[in-house]
Amino acid sequence: MNAPGERLGLPQIGKARPFALAMIIDAVGSGLFLPFSLLYFHYAVGLSLTEAGLGLTISMLIAVPTPLAAGVLVDRVGPRTVAVATNAARVAGFLGYLLVHDLTALIAVALLISVSDRLFWVAQPALIGEFATSGSRDRWFGLTVALRAVGLGIGGLLAGLAVSSLGIVGYHALVVANAVSFALAAVLIASLQVPRRASVAGLAKPGPKGFRAVLADRPFCWIVASNVVFGIARTMILVGFPVYAIQVLGAPAWLAGVLYAVYTALLAVAQTSLVRRLEHHRRTRALMLSALLWAGSFVLLAVAPLLPRQAIVAYLSAVTVLYTGAVMVHAGVIDALVIEAAPDTLRGRYVGGFNLSWAAANALAPGLFTTLLGWYAGLPWIALTALLLLALVGVRRAEPRLAWQAVHVRSDQPSGMLS
């Protein structure tokens, strides 16, 4: 690899260029629509904000178990096939949004997209595990985080321009553009060259099969349980920061957007370089570090009401940097740990089982935060700090029992693709 690429912590892209392009196109498309999804259904479709939020929530809740089925599907037909099919389904879903006129139709179409999203987010890590060498997987996952941050930022900027200049037509244009982005991503992923898959029968080992094997892997289950807490912590930039900053600390409304911009910019600029620095350390120790960084940022938030109001903007900006550091450390190792912990024949099931931790975190975070906030302003951050310390203990307990390659980065291997 050239020196600049090595310093930046980039993998050798090589024949995986279609995958990298697909990821950034996917992210740009998502950035076009996600920030304006509720507003689209309100202004362009005519639903109330309550109906739009209810429809999207119902569809996402119904789709929660999807990762389990996705894991089986990925193991049977391969992650590339699943990734292509789910992007095609997303195209159909977003074009279907143009035909939505009531709550029932919204739930039906949103369910197709929610299921497709969860299928894709099981297939994508498994696909990286299939085409990338063991020593390069951390870098590939770091690159996907950075590309997604860049793409979401670009998409959000373009979406704001489209809506402000085109009005209702702009909202429809966002939906069509997102559908086109998924179509392009499907074509690019279909063109990706991956090693020929060995037959499952030929690689099967004695012992529990299917999801029973995942459940029997107790150290891995400790990681999954700990990641529920990490997942809740990762949602706080959207779920907790804006409400706490504006309603509790009296910060100006524009600060929430600025803090999220700082968060996104740091992910885009620093994620891959940080992954390179983490390669010489155990992945489990990096997870423990992320727990401590998150805990530190939440303690600072808990005591923020004691500060003078004029110091809040600078203070929250500094806390956001610390919080983002925790996110980057966690994101830099967690997916590679899951892939390396999984036997090749059960990779999809391991990723699917692990993705339930994200589903649980996303479901729990809003209610947990608002309930605790209603009791006492600092209680959400105190409770999360305690949970993070428990998660740290869980990771520490799992560390000596995890597979060696799940804990250690095999940096002796080239940071490129399998052939």
List PLM regions with ranges.
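Structural signature of the two symmetry-related core transmembrane helices
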Residues: 81-96, 179, 285-301
